[in-house]
UniProtKB/Swiss-Prot annotation:
Subunit structure comment from the entry: Homodimer.
Example GO biological process: purine nucleotide biosynthetic process
Protein name (record): Bifunctional protein FolD
Reaction(s) catalysed by this chain's protein: (6R)-5,10-methylene-5,6,7,8-tetrahydrofolate + NADP(+) = (6R)-5,10-methenyltetrahydrofolate + NADPH; (6R)-5,10-methenyltetrahydrofolate + H2O = (6R)-10-formyltetrahydrofolate + H(+)
Organism per entry: Prochlorococcus marinus (strain MIT 9301)
The organism's taxonomic lineage, starting at the top: Bacteria, Bacillati, Cyanobacteriota, Cyanophyceae, Synechococcales
């Protein structure tokens, strides 16, 4: 039977440790950690994700500050808000909920976020430090995936790893992080020739293409580990209902793989948990708290 990599279970275990850590250090710091989330427009999925982050913050004792801006706001006004939050000593972490309306310069807004508060790890300073393998904020989804693998003692060093997808949010930073851990990484994308053949070489296959059910059994070798980053809401056979699926056609590959992540309940919860970790890391540095946060992770 294939091993289920249960991100929901692991995330709750880590959250419990984070809650204890904040409780034991809040008296020294004189305040709880603070996370600011900037949401622009009315994208329904963004609303769900922001709500999930707010709930997760509440569970561990982080104070969340939600800024929901109308999409008729100007770029300069958003930049001014970011600059204000950069100076706010009650804010340890800040993120721009993506996607945002196309009229905005997304990367320019992200570049305005102080790198020490950039809990999504998307500021060019943090990306540059990742390339150089220097300590910095790490992107949440890649960090969540690595901790999920570590929780089951799945080694990365020396493994052939194929990443399907090259986004700045997942594919690129994940590939760099795996390289820094001595994995042998191949990054693929929609233009890769013979994609299924390339994927069949993988000991660990990570699907982050953003295409529902792209990966079937023809992409997977016997005994591989498959990580599904995708999440899609599709119409079910009952037209009045929808169902969630990932980039992997799980029922087609499950008999071949050694381990897999479910959708939902796999990578998603760990992404949120690593956001909390990054926020607490920034809080810890500001107040010179001595405990090592890595001790709370797998």
């Amino acid at each position: 039977m294939s091993l289920k990599l249960d991100g929901k279970k692991l995330s709750l275990e880590i959250e419990e440790r984070l809650n204890e850590y904040i409780s034991s250090n809040k008296e020294i710091a004189k305040r709880a950690p603070g996370l600011a989330v900037i949401r622009i427009g009315e994208d329904p999925a963004s609303g769900v994700y922001v709500n999930n982050k707010e709930k997760a913050c509440s569970r561990v004792g982080i104070k969340s500050f939600i800024f929901h801006l109308k999409d008729n706001i100007e770029q300069k006004e958003v930049e001014q808000l970011i600059n204000k939050l950069n100076l706010d000593k009650n804010i340890d972490g800040m993120l721009l909920q993506l996607p945002i309306p196309k009229k905005f310069d997304e990367q320019k807004l992200i570049s305005h976020i102080n790198p020490s508060k950039d809990v999504d790890g998307l500021n060019e300073i943090n990306i540059g430090k990742l390339v150089k393998n220097e300590p910095a904020m790490r992107s949440c989804t890649p960090a969540g995936i690595i901790n999920l693998l570590r929780s089951q003692n799945i080694k990365i060093e020396g493994k052939k790893i194929v990443v399907v997808g090259r986004s700045l949010l997942v594919g690129k930073p994940l590939s760099l992080m795996l390289l820094n851990l001595n994995g042998t990484v191949t990054m693929t994308h929609s233009k890769t020739l013979n994609l299924n053949k390339v994927c069949r070489e993988a000991d660990i296959l990570i699907a982050a293409a953003g295409k529902p059910n792209l990966i079937d059994s023809s992409f997977v070798k016997e005994g591989a580990i498959i990580i599904d980053v995708g999440i899609h809401r599709l119409k079910s056979s009952n037209k009045n209902q929808t169902r969630l699926c990932g980039d992997v056609l799980l029922e087609d590959v499950i008999s071949k793989v050694f381990a897999y992540t479910p959708v939902p309940g796999g990578v998603g919860p760990m992404t949120v948990t690593m956001l909390l970790v990054n926020t607490i890391f920034s809080w810890q540095k500001q107040f010179g708290l001595s405990s090592n946060l890595n001790d709370l992770l797998p």
